[in-house]
Structure formats: structure tokens, C-alpha cells
UniProtKB/Swiss-Prot annotation:
Keyword terms: Cell membrane, Cytoplasm, Cytoskeleton, Disulfide bond, Glycoprotein, Membrane, Signal-anchor, Transmembrane, Transmembrane helix
Organism field: Pongo abelii
Membrane topology designation: Single-pass type II membrane protein
Region (Disordered) location: 1-33
Primary location: membrane
Name of the protein: Beta-sarcoglycan
Modification comment: Disulfide bonds are present.
């Protein structure tokens, strides 16, 4: 409207000459000019209170997600700082380098102080040792010390040391290379090391078991002992004694031969009174008999005062 009024005034002035304006018209014209002048500085701007203004930034769920990500990054930064401080305190990195360990060009890692470790995994063909003229001390805090390579394991505890291996084991002197103990029975005969008085095993497979000429061979078990041979079992000695709390069972496919002086204590053998009826109940009676050559055999008792003279016996003519 202001532009139309200005155009009409210009046409009137051009056709009729200069036209004098009143004070009111001049004030209105001056106000319009000021508005147009000020609008040049606000070109391209939109009032911030405009309802149709496009809203930017993270709002709603996106804003909450952004806050969670920022908090998570802050927590990770704090954890990283704590780990860095712990590593710095343990390794003791200072102006002069690392005070707790040394790294050498040959690949040697040397610890300069007492180190607390959980599990150590040496590299292939690596060595763990101590300094010259100093002992290497390895201790466990109320736990066993375990050295393991593949299926071979050495466990050192307070009251025992156990070695487990599926491929055998061998002990030798590192200076003289002399084999002290080996389980390679095809090459070396099995001998207990000097100072070892007993060997505790659950199952052993060997060709023979012998003792020294001046000592006895004692085989002790807490439960049941089974001695089995593929081609027979031969027990030889100056004196052979069997002490057991239960039953002793001898089984053989062909025969059982006892050579030498055989002593059988009958105090523990079950016996029945002479007044019992033969064959009463579920019991079957046998009489223990011995041949002149030491062969033992049993005879079923079918009548009173029955002896060992039966037709079917392993003694032959003499019994």
C-alpha cells in the first residue's frame, strides 16, 4: 500500500508539478522509508519464535541415546585411566626407564624384583631360569605350582610332588648328562632313584619286579590287589609271605604249582563240627589236599571220614 501511495504521488507530481505534503504524510513516508531501510539488514532471517521453524539437534530418544553414549565413553575413559595407573605402579616406569624389568635385544626378559604372576606361557623353545650363582625361587600362595607342557604336567604341593605324562619321563644330570631315572623300559631298566623307598601306582605293566639282594620286596595295597600274567605268574624268593585281611583267590587256566616248603595256617579256615549233617543247608564241603610235589587240590566231602584218595586227582600214583 505504501508503494502504491508513493507511485500515485509520483504520478501526480510529474503531471501537475511539485505537490506540497502535509506533516502527517511526511511522517508516514519517513516511517515507510525507515522500515524498508531496516528490512535490508534482516534479509534471510526468520524470527526464532516462529512456530513453523524447522527444529534441529537431537531430541527425544536420540537425545537420550546420545547421553548414554557419552556416559559410556566417560566410564571407559575412567577405566582406561585406572588400568594405566596400575600398570605404571606395577612396572614402575620412571625417568630412568622401567625399574622392575629389563628388555634385551636377544629376547631376554629379566625381572629385577619379586614378581607376582598367575599363569606364565613361555614361547616355543624358551627357557625360564635364574641368574648365575643365585637360586630361582618359585612359590605359590596356598596353591600348588604346576609346570605343564602338552600332556606332561609337574605339580609341586606342600606334601607331595606328582608327575603326569602320557609319553613317559626321564631325569638326567644337566652337567654330566647321565640318566638318573627313565620310563623308557625298552632302552633302560626301571630302577627307583637313590633315596626313594616306595613307589605308589594304581596300575603297572612290566615284565618283572625285583628287589635288591639285601632288601625285601613288599607289595602293599589298601583294597584289592590283582596280579595277572599273559603267560603265567612266577613268584620266587627266599621267603614268600602273604598277609591279607580278606580272601585270597588263585586262578589259573592249567595248574597252580607251589614249590618249596608250603605252610598254610588253618586257624582262619572255616570248619564245621562233626555233628553237622552232610549237605545240610546251602553249604558244600571240600577238603584241602596236597600232593607230594606241592600241588594243592580240593575234594568234595560226601561222607564222614572221607580222605583224599579219589580216582580223579592231579597227583597221579603218589598223593
Amino acid at each position: 500500500m505504501a508503494a502504491a501511495a508513493a507511485a500515485a504521488a509520483a504520478e501526480q507530481q510529474s503531471s501537475n508539478g511539485p505537490v506540497k505534503k502535509s506533516m502527517r504524510e511526511k511522517a508516514v513516508e519517513r516511517r515507510n522509508v525507515n522500515k524498508e531501510h531496516n528490512s535490508n539488514f534482516k534479509a534471510g532471517y526468520i524470527p526464532i519464535d516462529e512456530d513453523r521453524l524447522h527444529k534441529t539437534g537431537l531430541r527425544g530418544r536420540k537425545g537420550n541415546l546420545a547421553i548414554c553414549v557419552i556416559i559410556l565413553l566417560f566410564i571407559l575413559a575412567v577405566i582406561n585411566l585406572i588400568i594405566t595407573l596400575v600398570i605404571w605402579a606395577v612396572i614402575r616406569i620412571g625417568p630412568n626407564g622401567c625399574d622392575s624389568m629389563e628388555f634385551h635385544e636377544s629376547g631376554l626378559l629379566r625381572f629385577k624384583q619379586v614378581s607376582d604372576m598367575g599363569v606364565i606361557h613361555p614361547l616355543y623353545k624358551s627357557t625360564v631360569g635364574g641368574r648365575r650363582n643365585e637360586n630361582l625361587v618359585i612359590t605359590g600362595n596356598n596353591q600348588p605350582i604346576v609346570f605343564q607342557q602338552g600332556t606332561t604336567k609337574l605339580s609341586v604341593e606342600n606334601n607331595k610332588t606328582s608327575i603326569t605324562s602320557d609319553i613317559g619321563m626321564q631325569f638326567f644330570d644337566p652337567r654330566t648328562q647321565n640318566i638318573l631315572f627313565s620310563t623308557d623300559y625298552e632302552t633302560h631298566e626301571f630302577h627307583l632313584p637313590s633315596g626313594v623307598k616306595s613307589l605308589n601306582v594304581q596300575k603297572a605293566s612290566t615284565e618283572r619286579i625285583t628287589s635288591n639282594a639285601t632288601s625285601d620286596l613288599n607289595i602293599k595295597v589298601d583294597g584289592r590287589a590283582i596280579v595277572r600274567g599273559n603267560e603265567g605268574v612266577f613268584i620266587m624268593g627266599k621267603t614268600i609271605e602273604f598277609h591279607m585281611g580278606g580272601n585270597m583267590e588263585l586262578k589259573a587256566e592249567n595248574s597252580i604249582i607251589l614249590n618249596g616248603s608250603v605252610m598254610v595256617s588253618t586257624t582262619r579256615l572255616p570248619s564245621s563240627s562233626s555233628g553237622d549233617q552232610l549237605g545240610s543247608g546251602d553249604w558244600v564241603r571240600y577238603k584241602l589236599c596236597m600232593c607230594a610235589d606241592g600241588t594243592l587240590f580240593k575234594v568234595q566231602v560226601t561222607s564222614q571220614n572221607m580222605g583224599c584218595q579219589i580216582s580223579d586227582n592231579p597227583c597221579g600214583n603218589t598223593h
